[in-house]
């Protein structure tokens, strides 16, 4: 977004601008004159405009200049500002989080408690390198002697196979994309092969659930009696040989397709859907989910190999405190009660740049940072995030609905690629759904149906009059939503989705409906489809 970028440049008081290439510079050059820039650096070898009023150097010119000058180290302390990272929030103008050298060094030091990579291990990087999650991950991995390789969405799957990384840092949407790619390959196999794969996945699903209960690592069975854990251990023991056979016949091939050497996927920047947690555990690729925010540098909690409680965001990393309080009174709540998540520790930012009022609102006099997230603490001190306070949907009967867990459950359906719940002040929930057209085509063939779908850019009238809105497809989505919602742990009748609309344009960063870390910008999506949402509840 050019306007957002212009705002950040002005607000940050930057005097130097570093851009990827000449094409990018040409896009933003018109508003550079509004900013007191002294230097522009191109990270390419392209020749800049010599007549530009702002001094511009390409990468080679910068290196030549550096070779002529000796390095003069600058005396900095842990308390000094290291960077401004602007929140790519889902609402409002971005704010510059002031992170110190001490904030970032805490992450390098504390993340050793989460993963212990070996010198020479390879990590594949795909997230924006300016993002706090990626940035702290890079600092940590490089401090451990790892080799870091940057890839892109276009080259990601090829690089994964060729470079064979041991570690990856990513967001849930990335792991979902890998999962969908694997599912697509499995759906293309013969019916017999599909039945064999389904058999082993069902066996392994039972195996991992039993193992979790036996090891007291199940979010749904904290109060399991000794007898229940004994039965679970016995069941896991009996299923282990079949799970191992499935690993040899099926899961090893899947891992080989992902490079074959992955030891750890570190996931952050959003909740990980339960079916993804289950899938990667089944194929023996550990996913360590972490939690944090730009304002906390970012990691505050993380699961580890020795304490990997699926569905949770892990225990606090060293020197970090988590408090759950009542959102209205700010009084601490007992363990197990859901409330507002507050954070205190050496990773918490100094404040928002040039925004003292916003800083005072975010950080109280005792140093507690208001995350804006809702969650609760398990008996083993794991943090479980249930949603954003601002995202809560309040139905007209007064029931509060956290949309994220329900959305995560629904995208387990192979026919749902993306979705966003709506329903503020309505009788029931509704949903905007981006369907998986490939999976729908396969389903149609199995049903002896010839389905034709309009292009993504088709007018709404054409979409509504297409096969997407014919009874068989509509009934399929109704059944999928009903099943996935009801199968979700903690299901309540108010969780049911009574209305939905299908949209063909995916939520993306490019169309402004997702943040850079691939979180849906709910207000933007709501505004864009307000008419459709109104019609959903008026019909």
Predicted regions and their residues:
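Structural core segment of the AMP-binding/adenylate-forming
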Residues: 1-61
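Conserved pre-ATP/AMP-binding loop-to-beta segment of ANL
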Residues: 57, 64-86, 93, 116-122
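Conserved AMP-binding A3 loop
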Residues: 82-108
């Amino acid at each position: 977004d050019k306007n957002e970028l212009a705002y950040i440049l002005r607000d940050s008081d930057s005097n130097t601008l570093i851009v990827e290439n000449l094409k990018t510079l040409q896009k933003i050059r018109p508003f550079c004159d509004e900013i007191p820039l002294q230097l522009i650096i191109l990270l390419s070898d392209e020749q800049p405009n010599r007549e530009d009023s702002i001094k511009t150097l390409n990468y080679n010119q910068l290196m030549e200049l550096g070779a002529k000058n000796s390095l003069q180290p600058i005396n900095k302390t842990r308390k000094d500002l290291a960077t401004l990272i602007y929140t790519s929030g889902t609402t409002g103008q971005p704010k510059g989080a002031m992170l110190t050298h001490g904030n970032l060094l805490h992450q390098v030091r504390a993340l050793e408690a989460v993963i212990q990579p070996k010198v020479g291990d390879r990590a594949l990087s795909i997230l924006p390198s300016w993002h706090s999650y990626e940035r702290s991950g890079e600092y940590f991995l490089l401090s451990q002697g790892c080799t870091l390789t940057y890839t892109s969405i276009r080259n990601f799957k090829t690089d994964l196979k060729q470079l064979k990384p041991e570690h990856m840092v990513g967001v849930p949407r990335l792991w979902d994309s890998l999962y969908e790619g694997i599912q697509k390959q499995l759906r293309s196999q013969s019916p017999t092969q599909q039945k064999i794969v389904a058999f082993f996945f069902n066996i392994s699903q039972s195996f991992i659930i039993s193992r979790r209960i036996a090891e007291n690592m199940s979010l749904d069975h904290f109060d399991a009696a000794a007898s229940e854990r004994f039965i679970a251990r016995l069941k896991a023991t009996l299923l282990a040989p079949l799970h191992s056979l499935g690993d040899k016949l099926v899961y090893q091939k899947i891992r080989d397709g992902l490079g074959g050497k992955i030891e750890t996927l570190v996931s952050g920047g959003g909740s990980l859907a339960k079916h993804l947690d289950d899938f990667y555990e089944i194929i023996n690729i550990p996913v360590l989910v972490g939690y944090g925010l730009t304002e906390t540098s970012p990691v505050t909690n993380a699961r580890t190999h020795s304490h990997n409680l699926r569905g949770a965001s892990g225990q606090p990393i060293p020197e970090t405190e988590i408090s759950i309080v009542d959102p209205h009174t700010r009084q601490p709540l007992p363990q197990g009660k859901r409330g507002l998540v507050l954070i205190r520790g050496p990773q918490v930012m100094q404040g928002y740049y040039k925004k003292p009022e916003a800083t005072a609102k975010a950080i109280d006099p005792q140093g507690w940072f208001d995350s804006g997230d809702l969650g609760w603490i398990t008996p083993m001190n794991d943090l479980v995030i249930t949603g954003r306070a601002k995202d809560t949907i309040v139905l007209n009967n007064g029931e509060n609905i956290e949309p994220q867990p329900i959305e995560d459950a629904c995208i387990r359906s192979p026919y749902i690629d993306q979705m966003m719940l709506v329903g503020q002040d309505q009788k029931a929930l509704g949903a905007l759904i981006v369907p998986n057209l490939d999976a729908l085509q396969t389903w149609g063939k199995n049903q002896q149906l010839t389905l034709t779908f309009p292009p993504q850019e088709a007018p709404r009238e054409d979409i509504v009059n297409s096969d997407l809105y014919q009874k068989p497809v509509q009934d399929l989505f109704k059944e999928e939503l009903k099943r996935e919602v009801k199968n979700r742990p903690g299901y309540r009748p108010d969780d049911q989705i009574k209305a939905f609309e299908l949209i063909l344009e995916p939520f993306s960063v490019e169309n402004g409906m997702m943040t850079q870390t691939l979180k849906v910008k709910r207000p933007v999506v709501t505004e864009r489809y307000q008419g459709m949402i109104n019609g959903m509840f008026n019909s």
